[in-house]
């Protein structure tokens, strides 16, 4: 257990490849999304990585990770959020520094948030064209009831209403 309360595990790679994989799981998730702000955790999780950091705009972060041949992804789920990092062992120091910066100093760039919202709105419009999507929604409603977070899907109004300030406030709760 680290000083800040985070539980960390180190597992050796049996393949002996010169690769390092890191996974960070964060307690919290969509169950924290206020009514009317459904999709907040999902937006926050995506924008941690996609929105750059205070010292590295998104394009520079992308370029640096590309140069290192590293994969760094973040997500926000129903009950947890997290980060995945995969890179060469020789680059682990810089990769960990970038991962820490992404987690602790996100910029949540407005242009990247706007793009994410447009993409999510398009996906929402297509939801009724996908039987599997309808099924996931209905199973959540039938299993948990309409007021349970796992059954609450983002509406167009909720997605359009998400702001950079919402992401910053959510970040303060999550990290």
PLM feature segments, named:
Residues 1, 171-175:
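Short, intrinsically disordered, charge-balanced linker/junction segments flanking boundaries
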Residues 128, 169-172:
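A generic local secondary-structure boundary/capping motif
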Residues 2-3, 13:
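Active-site beta-strand termini and strand-to-loop segments that position acidic
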């Amino acid at each position: 257990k680290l000083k800040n309360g985070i539980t960390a595990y180190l597992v050796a790679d049996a393949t002996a490849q010169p690769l390092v994989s890191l996974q960070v799981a964060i307690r919290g998730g969509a169950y924290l999304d206020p009514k009317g702000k459904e999709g907040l955790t999902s937006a926050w999780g995506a924008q941690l990585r996609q929105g750059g950091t205070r010292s590295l705009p998104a394009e520079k972060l992308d370029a640096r990770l590309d140069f290192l041949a590293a994969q760094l992804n973040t997500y926000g789920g129903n009950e947890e959020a997290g980060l995945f990092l995969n890179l060469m062992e020789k680059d682990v120091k810089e990769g960990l520094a970038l991962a820490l910066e992404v987690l602790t100093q996100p910029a949540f760039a407005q242009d990247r948030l706007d793009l994410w919202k447009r993409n999510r709105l398009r996906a929402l419009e297509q939801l009724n064209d996908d039987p599997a999507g309808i099924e996931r929604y209905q199973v959540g409603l039938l299993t948990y009831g309409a007021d349970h977070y796992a059954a609450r899907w983002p509406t167009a109004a909720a997605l359009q209403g998400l702001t950079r300030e919402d992401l910053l406030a959510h970040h303060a709760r999550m990290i």
